[in-house]
């Protein structure tokens, strides 16, 4: 079986995200979702997550894909993953992240590889049509200071000092 995925969002977005991904890829196995609706709290969400986990094969790990960092779905999932190996919470869930993560699971990647892929495709999936892509910041070479003449100074020559700092701490 593949790595388990649980989608958690505010409102009914989690169910719709899963339906959208399944519309593109077909039905997915070892996946569940929880919605956080008014009147619920973190304890309710933890109960929902734990109930969903009982129906999933978690032997290879679980990735919680949630909407926002610090939101209730994130906080509840964070409390579940704290003492478990191969459990992770990723925020910013979107359709490209889901689609790529589901497709990659078919290739049986390692847990860390799937987490990295979800993060990368989630970021790359957010774009603007007309905005120019930011160019990678290239370090600008510092202009070289003008070179002083290499010839020794004669007694008639004078040194020009532009700035001087006197430090009386010594």
Cite the ranges covered by each PLM segment:
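N-terminal small/polar loop signature for handling phosphorylated ligands or for N-terminal nucleophile
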Residues: 47-59
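Short, acidic/small-residue loops that bind anionic groups at enzyme active sites
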Residues: 83-101, 114-115
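Short Gly/Thr/Asp-enriched flexible loops that form oxyanion-binding sites at enzyme active sites
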Residues: 73-84, 103
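Short, glycine-/small-residue-rich phosphate/pyrophosphate-handling segment
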Residues: 104-134
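N-terminal intrinsically disordered, cationic/polar leader segments
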Residues: 2-3, 8-48
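Short coil/turn segments at beta-strand junctions that form active-site/ligand-binding loops
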Residues: 1-3, 60-61, 85-86
